[in-house]
């Protein structure tokens, strides 16, 4: 089935309007996994001309964003959460090595929190994963990757705190 951005966004809006909590986010994650299998959708929204971060839809009522991410080379992010909101990562091409982290010491403004590694896993094309409010994780991409990602709200508009791995906290 061919998906359009408009239909995809409307489906996600209906799900999140009915259930904005974790269960609703899991339903959106399942819909995203279906959309990731649609090569026409992927080609339309994740072409070579797409930057590393592009909001392709922002819901005026609920505030969630659908983003396209195209990374042409390796990238790594430090451990982070999404502040007061959530995210869903959907892998369209390439692979992302994701690490989940547990809080050792909370962060505060001007003082990074410390975290310890819990597990590593690979997001492969067609896979999606929910990161709820407060979930700490870090992605590593060793080569070109393309993702469709959700944010509960545009994270560039919110203040987030920094974290670092406990072993390197004193380095």
Task: Outline where the language-model segments fall.
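N-terminal leader/capping segments at the start of a protein or of a new domain
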Residues: 1-40
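A short glycine-rich, His/Asp/Glu-containing loop-to-beta-strand
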Residues: 45-73
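A short beta-loop-beta micro-motif enriched in histidine and acidic residues
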Residues: 58-64, 75-88
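Conserved short histidine dyad/triad with adjacent acidic residue
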Residues: 68-82, 122, 132-134
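Short beta-strand His + acidic residue motifs that chelate non-heme Fe in jelly-roll/DSBH
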Residues: 77-80, 98-99, 131, 136-142, ...
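Glycine- and acidic-residue-biased ligand/ion/polar-headgroup-sensing regions
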Residues: 84-102
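A short hydrophobic beta-strand segment most commonly corresponding to one strand
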Residues: 88, 143-160
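Short acidic-glycine-tyrosine-enriched beta hairpin
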Residues: 88, 103-136
């Amino acid at each position: 089935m061919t998906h359009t951005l408009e239909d995809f966004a409307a489906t996600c809006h209906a799900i999140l309007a009915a259930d904005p909590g974790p269960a609703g986010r899991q339903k959106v994650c399942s819909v995203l996994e279906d959309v990731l299998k649609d090569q026409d959708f992927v080609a339309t929204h994740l072409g070579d001309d797409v930057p590393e971060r592009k909001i392709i839809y922002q819901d005026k009522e609920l505030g969630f964003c659908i983003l396209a991410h195209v990374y042409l080379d390796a990238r790594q992010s430090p451990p982070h959460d999404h502040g007061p909101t959530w995210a869903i990562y959907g892998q369209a091409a390439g692979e992302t090595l994701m690490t989940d982290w547990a809080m050792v010491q909370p962060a505060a403004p001007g003082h990074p929190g410390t975290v310890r590694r819990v597990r590593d896993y690979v997001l492969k094309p067609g896979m999606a994963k929910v990161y709820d409010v407060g979930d700490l994780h870090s992605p590593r991409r060793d080569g070109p990757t393309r993702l469709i990602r959700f944010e509960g709200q545009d994270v560039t508009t919110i203040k987030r705190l920094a974290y670092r791995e406990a072993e390197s906290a004193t380095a």
